[in-house]
Swiss-Prot record:
Keyword set includes Acyltransferase: no
Organism: Shigella sonnei (strain Ss046)
Catalysed reactions, semicolon-separated: 5-amino-1-(5-phospho-beta-D-ribosyl)imidazole + S-adenosyl-L-methionine = 4-amino-2-methyl-5-(phosphooxymethyl)pyrimidine + CO + 5'-deoxyadenosine + formate + L-methionine + 3 H(+)
Protein name: Phosphomethylpyrimidine synthase
Gene Ontology CC: cytosol
Reported function: Catalyzes the synthesis of the hydroxymethylpyrimidine phosphate (HMP-P) moiety of thiamine from aminoimidazole ribotide (AIR) in a radical S-adenosyl-L-methionine (SAM)-dependent reaction.
Requisite cofactors: [4Fe-4S] cluster
Keyword Repeat attached: no
Assembly and binders: Homodimer.
Length: 631
């Protein structure tokens, strides 16, 4: 393994090559489609999986086929999933939302950046080689105006973003005609309200009630609108970010593109190393999905990593810097209060959240209340001016199953509920972060506590991991908990990669984490009964029963791995049409036997029916025509 490990220079060169040669790419036998809305510019991208026809009879010389409908699926890849779009990372993506933002007339361009740090970076000629060349002129709300999707929703306004989301959440299921494909088991939604058809008005109503958020900073016009809420599809977040130890700008852009290709609904940039500002600019200008950050990480860098030296002024400057770059949501650890820190003393693993430990250390060293809590209203004012959503961080989340659901965890959660109401006063969108490490029997309480004390604001959890014994497989241990809490009502799940607790994930780790979590959220959507969630499963089952191998590969979340595993034992082209796989072989294939039984039963029914008719014919004397009273 060590013989094939790339050097840092090789890793960067590979990432640079990826970026330089990047082009829109479709999955096997898929094509990009767009569904238009009523608002100008609303063209919702989806991936449509093309399927082969089913053989239904005929002869070898003249076979008869029945067409199978193409299956539309949700697509997070943006322009990177459209082969017709030319990609240029140096220029960034097209500004999809810019006309909608401008048309509202409630923003203004800034002549001077609000952040001292940003102005310093822009004045540094030594950063020219690293800097993204096409910098946007940032906008903010005009004086006295609020520009959040929550504000518009409360005013009764259906924005283009809301219509875009309604179309997207329906996943093109109105295109499906087959009753076999449309069949769906009733879900158990635990109080969630899942309409048969998601309308733009329903989206507006959910956002207005605070049950859902649309992360959409006015300075990130490249992003495609998406929604986070328990009455919608469960979403997945992927974490990327450089560190002081490893990774580079080109590698993080590569991981961003890779993440969106494999289904990340949002991406968090958790960079802690050099060039945080420049890295984030490249990511934002090339991201079709919302970008989140943890601003305290960069604020800490500004004071040389010394938590005690953090100040509100440095943190505020960081918020302005990131808001004007276009960050869509901030994780803020404002619920780590001074009086809660002693509650963690008896824990097995103490405080495991980086942001939580930073704020706990600051509180103890100054013996003062958390300055994020003290200045929370000012944080909300900043967010309202740019439409930055708040992700209220769980700094006291449990880091082991022994510490799950303890006093400190729920004390902080209740405080996050109080902060949610304050944020809503400013029309700021809010979601709540959750654990962590929780055994299966204790997971549901996390959801019920959050709904009750945080007023149904969307829940966003890391897993949770259901056992602590599997380093190297924590994408699996957490995927179990993720599927469960998604079913119970969690709105978004932060992926966990195989490298969790072990190291910084690479591209393959990112893919493994995302596929694991796409499985978890899909299982949750099925269990909740999200309309149309079962269509892809039904299409896969039909293809499997009919031995349409190519369709099985292409319907899979990861077509490449599915094909590779099949071809390990049946690599020949004949294996793609064989009515068996290598598991059972031709004589013991259950589905082949089932088909034979079905054909036999159908033949027997016809034969018995014909025999009955013949006997009836003879009983009536063999007359072709009968008198009316005999018929």
């Amino acid at each position: 393994m060590s013989a094939t490990k790339l050097t840092r220079r090789e890793q960067r060169a590979r990432a640079q090559h990826f970026i330089d040669t990047l082009e829109g790419t479709a999955f096997p036998n898929s094509k990009r489609i767009y569904i238009t809305g009523t608002h100008p510019g609303v063209r919702v991208p989806m991936r449509e999986i093309q399927l082969s026809p089913t053989l239904i009879g005929g002869s070898k010389e003249q076979p008869q086929y029945e067409e199978n409908e193409a299956i539309p699926v949700y697509d997070t890849s943006g322009p990177y999933g459209d082969p017709q779009i030319a990609i240029n990372v140096q220029q960034g993506l097209a500004k999809l939302r810019q006309p909608w933002i401008d048309a509202r007339g409630d923003t203004e361009e800034l002549t001077v950046r609000s952040s001292d740090y940003t102005r310093t970076r822009l004045a540094d000629d030594g950063l020219d080689e690293l800097r993204f060349s096409g910098l946007l002129t940032p906008k903010r709300a005009k004086t006295g105006r609020r520009v959040t999707q929550l504000h518009y929703a409360r005013q009764g306004i259906i924005t283009p973003e809301m219509e875009f989301i309604a179309i997207r959440e329906n996943m093109g299921r109105e295109r499906i005609r087959s009753e076999v494909l449309r069949h769906q088991h009733p879900g158990m939604s635990f109080g969630a309200h899942l309409p048969e058809n998601i309308t733009a008005e329903f989206v507006r109503d959910e956002v207005a009630a605070g049950r859902a958020i649309i992360p959409a900073n006015i300075n990130h016009p490249e992003s495609e609108p998406m929604i986070i809420g328990r009455n919608f599809l469960v979403k997945v977040n992927a974490n990327i970010g450089n560190s002081a130890v490893t990774s580079s700008i080109e590698e993080e852009v590569e991981k961003l593109v890779w993440s969106t290709r494999w289904g990340a609904d949002t991406v968090m940039d958790l960079s802690t190393g050099r060039y945080i500002h420049e890295t984030r600019e490249w990511i934002l200008r090339n991201s079709p999905v919302p970008i989140g950050t943890v601003p305290i990480y960069q604020a800490l860098e500004k004071v040389n990593g010394i938590a005690e030296d953090l100040t509100w002024e440095a943190f505020r400057d960081t918020l302005l810097e990131q808001a004007e770059q276009g960050v869509d949501y901030f994780t803020i650890h404002a619920g780590v209060l001074l009086r809660y820190v002693p509650m963690t003393a008896k824990r097995l693993t103490g405080i495991v959240s980086r942001g939580g430990s930073i704020m706990a250390k600051w509180c103890l060293s100054h013996h003062q209340e958390n300055f994020l809590y003290q200045h929370f209203r000012e944080i909300c004012e900043i967010c309202a001016a740019y439409d930055v959503s708040l992700s209220l961080g769980d700094g006291l989340r449990p880091g082991s199953i022994q510490d799950a659901n303890d006093e400190a965890q729920f004390a902080e959660l209740h405080t996050l509920g109080e902060l949610t109401k304050i944020a809503w006063e400013y029309d700021v969108q809010v979601m709540i972060e959750g654990p962590g490490h929780v055994p299966m029997q204790m997971i549901r309480r996390n959801m019920t506590e959050e709904l009750e004390h945080c007023h149904e604001a969307p829940f966003y959890t890391l897993g949770p991991l259901t056992t602590d014994i599997a380093p190297g497989y924590d994408h699996f241990t957490s995927g179990i908990g993720a599927a469960m809490i998604g079913w119970f009502g969690c709105a978004m799940l932060c992926y966990v990669t195989p490298k969790e607790h072990l190291g910084l994930p690479n591209k393959e780790d990112v893919k493994q984490g995302l596929i694991t979590y796409k499985i978890a959220v899909h299982a949750a959507d099925l269990a909740k009964g999200h309309p149309g969630a079962q269509i892809r499963d039904n299409a896969m089952s039909k293809a499997r029963f009919e031995f349409r191998w190519e369709d099985q590969f292409n319907l899979a979340l990861d077509p490449f791995t599915a094909r590779a595993y099949h071809d390990e034992t049946l690599p020949q082209e004949s294996g793609k049409v064989a009515h068996f796989c290598s598991m059972c072989g031709p004589k013991f294939c259950s589905m082949k036997i089932s088909q034979e039984v079905r054909d036999y039963a159908a033949a027997q029914t016809i034969e018995v029916g014909m025999a009955d008719m013949s006997e009836n014919f003879r009983a009536r004397g063999g007359e072709i025509y009968l008198r009316k009273e005999e018929a």
